[in-house]
């Protein structure tokens, strides 16, 4: 057990000062995730809330602390320079004028009543400008607190940019905040030949480089500049102290209305282009920064979205299919009762939704997984099998090859009256499922109760912004996992733009896409969503390599704008 394992909250509450890291939610520590899971209140800037909220329990109160997002007109606290902050109590159901407090008062107010408060800050609490003041306020108010360190941007961002700060020779490393650095500080780091990590803003990089040159650094000293570090919006430029201003202008980064964005600049030989080109592991991911549309139900999209993120992509889940109960539930009710009374030898699940439908009926009747005792269970696909295991049922049969109805039939044993006391199979399925499994089981000698367990209907249209992005080329790729997702997406949102890469799970889905005027760029080698994601990543890797070999910049598909609409492929 960790020595920092959470104790019961004291009467006056408990505050955890938590480092949220530089931006990638995957960089949160195990201790941070534990603290977030037990929090009653989250206190943080909006961008930090976006990083930590996925690990918080449902119903946690969120308190944004940035006045730009909450109320740009809020004044500073008198005499402190600290912005006054809106208190947003997520436990309140009434709408009223929020109180205005400084950060310390906000944390204290959130801790009242014995609540666990997580005060999340970007990077590490030890480097936050106001965290120490808030800790002292906790001491004065008798509120216990703890500190959960996080990865500081000055360390995490260079690692994601492919710039190691030290090597075997143990070179000196200096960290400078350009906003507060004194002339003496610049003189000291300028006289050193070690690596310098500068925290600054995009429009102040050139000025910081000038300070280092004035202090003695050579103008040809290598320099990297990274913006939005550790996120899929990360961009890194390589230059020298003397050329950084010109490099950013040529890249059309400056001048920019976003010049105030924070950046991390690394000065020294570790930033040399020859070395960084080999070590830039993050930005060289096959689909880095790609916005990928995943038109599926939210329940089905989670694992696929995680896989896409591992390739550097930004998945955007758009439900195209909604699941509803059958219009006439009596058939389903009789079948579930038949499971209990011994009517079936087998039950076959072909989707997660089928498992969910049966489970809901079980719960309605007060049943649980024990009702499957004596019944053989089959499942198509890893996700369906996982849903059964989560229910407490381990499937007896999963296709050894193709994860489809056809694959299940190939492995299904024929009915044998000697070994099979019952000849009937319960098949709960969607109202639009194919008849492949039913026909195959009948051919093997089984009787099949083919029962509509749920209906699939077209989902509501996505927000207007998403529809415009689909039709206007805002997405780099779209993944179609069935013919119905093609038809439904086009029906509720319109046809994807011609620059969007179209990826399909199999020939039938590809044929439907072509019938809708889309050219299919990627097709999975086998009908699996994860194989489809792998195929799309391979496509992205080949595309990236081709650009590098041609001496062209690596761009995303959405950064191209050819005039002609994509037509159906004739090859």
Regions found by a protein language model. Give the residues of each.
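Conserved beta-alpha
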Residues: 49, 69-82, 147-158, 171-183, ...
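Conserved anion/nucleotide-ligand pocket segment
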Residues: 183-226
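Active-site/ligand-binding-proximal alpha/beta "capping" segment
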Residues: 108, 112-115, 126, 130-140, ...
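Class I S-adenosyl-L-methionine
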Residues: 1-148, 342-354, 372-373
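Well-ordered beta-strand positions
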Residues: 39-41, 61, 195, 477, ...
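Short glycine/serine/threonine-rich phosphate/pyrophosphate-binding segments
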Residues: 25-28, 126-132, 151-157, 204-208, ...
């Amino acid at each position: 057990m960790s020595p920092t394992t959470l104790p019961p909250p004291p009467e006056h509450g408990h505050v955890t000062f938590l480092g949220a890291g530089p931006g990638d939610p995957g960089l949160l520590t195990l201790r941070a995730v534990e603290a977030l899971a037990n929090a009653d209140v989250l206190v943080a800037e909006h961008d930090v809330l976006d990083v930590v909220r996925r690990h918080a329990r449902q119903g946690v109160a969120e308190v944004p602390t940035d006045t730009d997002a909450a109320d740009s007109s809020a004044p500073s606290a008198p005499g402190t320079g600290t912005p006054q902050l809106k208190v947003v109590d997520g436990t309140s159901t009434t709408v009223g004028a929020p109180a205005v407090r400084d950060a310390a008062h906000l944390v204290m107010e959130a801790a009242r009543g014995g609540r666990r408060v997580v005060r999340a800050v970007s990077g590490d609490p030890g480097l936050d400008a106001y965290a120490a003041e808030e800790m002292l306020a906790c001491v004065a108010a008798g509120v216990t607190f703890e500190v959960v360190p996080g990865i500081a941007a000055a360390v995490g961002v260079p690692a994601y940019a492919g710039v190691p700060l030290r090597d075997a020779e143990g070179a000196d490393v200096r960290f400078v905040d350009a906003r507060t650095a004194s002339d003496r500080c610049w003189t000291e780091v300028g006289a050193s030949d070690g690596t310098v990590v500068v925290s600054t803003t995009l429009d102040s990089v050139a000025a910081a480089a000038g300070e280092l040159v004035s202090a003695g650094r050579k103008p040809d000293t290598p320099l990297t500049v990274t913006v939005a570090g550790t996120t899929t919006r990360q961009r890194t430029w390589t230059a020298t102290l003397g050329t950084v201003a010109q490099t950013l202008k040529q890249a059309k980064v400056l001048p920019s209305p976003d010049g105030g964005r924070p950046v991390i600049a690394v000065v020294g030989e570790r930033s040399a282009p020859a070395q960084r080109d080999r070590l830039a592991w993050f930005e060289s991911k096959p689909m880095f920064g790609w916005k990928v549309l995943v038109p599926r139900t939210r329940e089905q999209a989670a694992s696929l979205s995680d896989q896409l993120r591992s390739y550097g992509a930004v998945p955007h889940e758009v439900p195209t299919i909604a699941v509803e109960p059958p219009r006439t539930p009596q058939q389903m009710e009789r079948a579930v009762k038949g499971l209990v009374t011994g009517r079936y030898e087998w039950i076959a699940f072909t989707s997660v939704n089928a498992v969910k439908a049966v489970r809901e009926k079980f719960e309605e009747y007060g049943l649980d997984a024990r009702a499957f005792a004596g019944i053989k269970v089959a499942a198509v696909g890893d996700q369906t099998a996982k849903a059964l295991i989560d229910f407490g049922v381990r499937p007896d049969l999963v296709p050894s090859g193709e994860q489809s109805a056809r694959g299940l039939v190939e492995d299904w044993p024929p009915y044998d009256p000697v070994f099979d006391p019952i000849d009937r199979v319960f098949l709960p399925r969607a109202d639009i499922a194919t008849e492949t499994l039913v026909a195959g089981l009948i051919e093997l000698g089984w009787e099949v109760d083919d029962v509509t367990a749920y209906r699939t209907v077209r989902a509501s249209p996505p927000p207007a912004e998403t529809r415009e992005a689909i039709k206007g080329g805002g997405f780099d790729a779209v993944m179609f996992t069935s013919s119905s997702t093609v038809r439904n997406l086009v029906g509720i949102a319109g046809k994807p733009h011609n620059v969007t890469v179209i990826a399909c799970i199999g020939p039938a889905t590809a044929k439907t896409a072509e019938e809708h005027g889309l050219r299919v760029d990627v097709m999975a080698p086998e009908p699996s969503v994860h194989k489809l994601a792998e195929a799309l990543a391979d496509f992205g890797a080949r595309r990236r390599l081709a650009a590098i070999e041609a001496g062209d910049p690596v761009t995303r598909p959405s950064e191209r704008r050819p005039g002609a609409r994509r037509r159906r492929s004739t090859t």
